[in-house]
Each structure stands twice: as C-alpha cells, then as structure tokens.
UniProtKB/Swiss-Prot annotation:
Protein name: 8-oxoguanine DNA glycosylase/AP lyase
Role noted for this protein: Catalyzes the excision of an oxidatively damaged form of guanine (7,8-dihydro-8-oxoguanine = 8-oxoG) from DNA. Also cleaves the DNA backbone at apurinic/apyrimidinic sites (AP sites).
Entry superkingdom: Archaea
Organism: Korarchaeum cryptofilum (strain OPF8)
Keywords, in A-Z order: DNA damage, DNA repair, Glycosidase, Hydrolase, Lyase, Multifunctional enzyme
Site positions (Important for guanine/8-oxoguanine distinction): 209
Active site: 131, 149
A Pfam family that the UniProt record links to this protein: Ogg-HhH
Catalytic activity, EC: 3.2.2.-, 4.2.99.18
Catalytic activity: 2'-deoxyribonucleotide-(2'-deoxyribose 5'-phosphate)-2'-deoxyribonucleotide-DNA = a 3'-end 2'-deoxyribonucleotide-(2,3-dehydro-2,3-deoxyribose 5'-phosphate)-DNA + a 5'-end 5'-phospho-2'-deoxyribonucleoside-DNA + H(+)
Length: 209
C-alpha cells in the first residue's frame, strides 16, 4: 500500500454519498461568524489539543457562556468535572485568549496567506500548535492547511506512507507530512481542508467537526 492506494480510496469516496456530507460540512465552515463565535471556535481547538475532537465538542457545549464569564479557577474546576485531561492548563489558555475577542477578526483579515496566519496563531496564542491552529483555520473557512492529528498519522502508517508514527510533531516534521497531504490533494482535486474530512472518514467512519 502507498499514496496511490490512498488516492484511489479517496476518489472512491468522492463518488459516494459521503461527498455530499463533506461538502455540506465545508459550507458550514464558510459561514459568517460573530466575534463570540470566532472565539468559540478557538476555544474548541484549544480544548482538543492532546484530547479528542468529540470530547472537546462535548465540553465546549457543556461550558456554554462559561468560556466568556468564568474565572480561571472556576473554569479549571468545571473542566475537571467534565473530564478534560488538562483542566488547569486549558483554563489558563482560554482565559488568556479572551483578550483576542475584539481583535481576532481584524488579525485574521490582515493576512493574505493562511500559512503565515497559522504561524502568527502558533506564536501568539498560548496552547495552539500547528495542528490546533490548522483546525481553527479550517473550521472558519480556510482550505489550504492540514490538520495532522493522531487519526491522520495512524492512517498514513496503515497505508505505508509513514514508516513510523512520530511521538511529537516539530514544525519541520509537520510541514513535511503536510507536503505529502498536498500531493494527495493535488491528485484528488480536493483542497486540504476537505481532504482532512475524507481521511478522517476513512480512518473513523465519521465526518466530524
């Protein structure tokens, strides 16, 4: 197995009902958002770091407006109660990120290149790595960054595209794996943001946020 096999499997899915579900999800990502909704997406991505997307979504929904109003201590207690693995750190990151609420939209629109915007997010938002910053950007409508999480790494291992699963992803390694996904993107005619949903489906049988 290798890149050719993965390309073929993606193309098969592209011709199935899964394509409709994925295209609908991509349209949802492109909708206009308020400043509060942008922050909510950012918090979702902070919650999913070293955690699961499903768990992050469940906790975000349970927190409600608490992401805007709770003190760091209250937020940490609530996150612990809801079962997050790193309640104190995530509470710290969320409270720290609140300062971005009034300026995040302007920061996003000031960048023409989404890769440079991703670099800015990684450097300036505590708790965001390349995976989380890419996830945030895809979820607000950007299409040319890859969300490389353990599901994607497992999939690339299964297809023999990666020889071993990296324990951690440095910037250089992240960009190297992203370049492999760019090749698959070119060959399938599917942008990176959408490709992530196809790969997630192949690995998990689900189309997630």
């Amino acid at each position: 197995m290798g890149v050719d096999d993965l390309v073929n499997d993606v193309m098969r899915l592209k011709g199935s009902r899964v394509r409709e579900i994925i295209e609908r999800r991509m349209r949802e990502f492109e909708r206009e958002r308020s400043d509060e909704e942008l922050f909510k997406e950012l918090v979702f991505c902070l919650l999913t770091a070293n955690f699961s997307a499903e768990g992050g979504l469940r906790i975000l929904e349970s927190l409600g407006d608490g992401i805007f109003t709770l003190s760091e201590e209250e937020l940490a207690a609530k996150l612990a109660e809801l079962g997050h693995r790193y309640p104190r750190k995530r509470a710290e990151f969320i409270v720290e990120a609140r300062k971005l609420i009034p300026i995040l939209r302007d920061i996003i629109s000031s960048f023409r290149d989404e890769r440079l915007l991703r670099e800015w997010l990684v450097k300036n938002v505590k708790g965001l790595g390349y995976k989380e910053a890419s996830h945030f950007l895809r979820n607000i409508g950007f299409k040319n960054v890859s969300i490389i999480d353990y599901h994607i790494l497992d999939l690339l291992m299964k297809y023999g595209i990666l020889e071993e699963k990296p324990k951690s992803l440095s910037r250089a390694r992240y960009l190297m794996i992203e370049s492999i996904l760019e090749e698959i993107s070119r060959r399938t005619g599917i942008n990176l943001g959408e490709l992530d949903l196809y790969l997630w489906y192949i690995e998990t049988g689900k189309v997630l946020k």
